Amino acid sequence: MSQNSEFHDDNALLDIHDRPKPLAWAGLSLQHMFSMFGSTVIVPLLVGLSPSIALFSSGIGTLLHIMITQRKIPAYMGSSFAFITPMLALMKTTGYPGIAQGVVSVGIVYLIIAAIIWAVGSNWVDKILPPIVVGPIVMVIGLSLAGSAATDAMMKNGHYNLTYFMIALATLGIAIFCNMAFKGLIGLIPVLLGIVGGYLISMALGLVDLHAIAVAPWFKIPAFEFPGISYPFKLNFGAIITIAPIAFVTMTEHMGHIMVLNELTHRNFFKDPGLNRTLAGDGVASLVAGLIGGPAVTSYGENIGVMMITKVHSVYVLIGAAVFAMIFAFVNKLNVLIMQMPLPVIGGISFLLFGTIATSGIQVMIDDKVDLSKKRNLMIASTTLVIGIGNAYLQIGQFQFTGLALATIIAIILNLVMPQEAASEKVIKSVE
C-alpha cells in the first residue's frame, strides 16, 4: 500500500488526481450526486429540517473536506443518520437553535481529536487496525445496510409489494448490464443509468407525482439558519451534551470508510494526508453545516460503492458532485424531481452499492492471506461480523454505541488482548 502522494494506481480507470473529459466529468459527478441524494435528504425530512440546506451542506462540506485533506481523499460528505434520534428529541424541546449548537459541537469534538492526533502521531493506527480487523469491519459497513436496501426495494407502507421489488430488480439489472456490456461513457456511469432507468419505469407505472414537479418553482433560495441572525443565540449545554458524545461513534464509522478507501486506492490515508486531516475535514464540514441550518455530515458509503463499481477514483469527480449538489439546492424543480425518486429505485441500486463494499472487505483478507483456520483470526472475524450485521448495541444512559461502532471497538479490543495462538494450537505445534 503506497504512502507516496506521487503514486498512480494504473488499475483505476481514473486515479485520484486524474481529470476526466468535460462530458464524462459531468456524467460521473451527477452519478455520485444521485447516489447520495436519497440518504442526504431523508435525514432532514425525518427531523424537520430543510432538505435544500442539507443538500447545500453536503456540497460545501465535501469541498471543505477535500481542501483540508489536500485533494488526496475522494470522499463525499452527506447527512449522518447517527444523530437522528437526539435531533428529533431536541426539535421537540429547543427547536433548531439547540440542534445547531449540538451539530457545531460535533465539529469541535472532531477538531479537538484531530489536534491530539496531530500532536501524538498516528503510528498506533497500524497496530490496532491490522487486516483481520479491517476486513470484517469493511464487510460490516456494507452488510449492515443490507436490511435497509431490502426494505426500500420490497416494502410499501410496511407491506410487501411485488411491483416495488420488480422495479428494484429492473434498476439493479440495468446498472449491471451497463457496467458489463458497454465501454466508454456509458460503461462509466452504470449507477446513474440504473437510477434513471428505474425512475422512468416508476414514472410509467404512476409512482411519481408529476403534478408536484410541474407546479414547483424553478428556483428557490434555501431558508438558511444563521445563529444571531435567523434566531437569537443562547448557549444550551443540554443540547451540546445530547449530541456531542455521538461524535465518537461516527469517528469509528469515519475510520471504517477511510479503511475502505485505503484498500480501494492502494494508499494509506492514515499516513498521507494523515488521520488528523481526515478528521479535521469531517469536523469542519459538520461545524459549517450547523452554522447554516444543516445536519451533521459524514463520509458516505454509497459514493465509495460507486467508485468500486466504476474504478473511477478521481477527486475532481467528487468536486463536481459537490458543486452540482450546491446548485441543485437552489434549483427547486430539479430538487423536487429527485425527491420524488421512488424507494424501490434507491433499494435496487443499493443492492449493488452496499454489496460491493462488503466484498471489498473479503478482498482485504484475501490480499493479506489472513488464515481463518487460526482460532484467533476466526474469533475476531466471527464476533465482528455478527455484532455489526446484527446491529447489537451498548447503551449507557442517552449514549449508545450501535452496530458498526460497537463491532469496531470489540474487534480492536480482541485484536489487542488475544494471544497470537490458542493453547490448543501450541500443543499441536509441540507434538509436531
Describe the role of every protein-language-model region.
Residues 49-55, 71-83, 125-134, 186-192, ...:
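Short, non-helical or kinked segments that cap or interrupt transmembrane helices
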Residues 1-77, 82-95:
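N-terminal signal-anchor module of multipass membrane proteins
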Residues 93-211, 320-429:
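Membrane-embedded alpha-helical modules
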Residues 8-23, 45-66, 242-315, 429-431:
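Membrane-embedded helical hairpins/re-entrant loop segments and their flanking transmembrane helices
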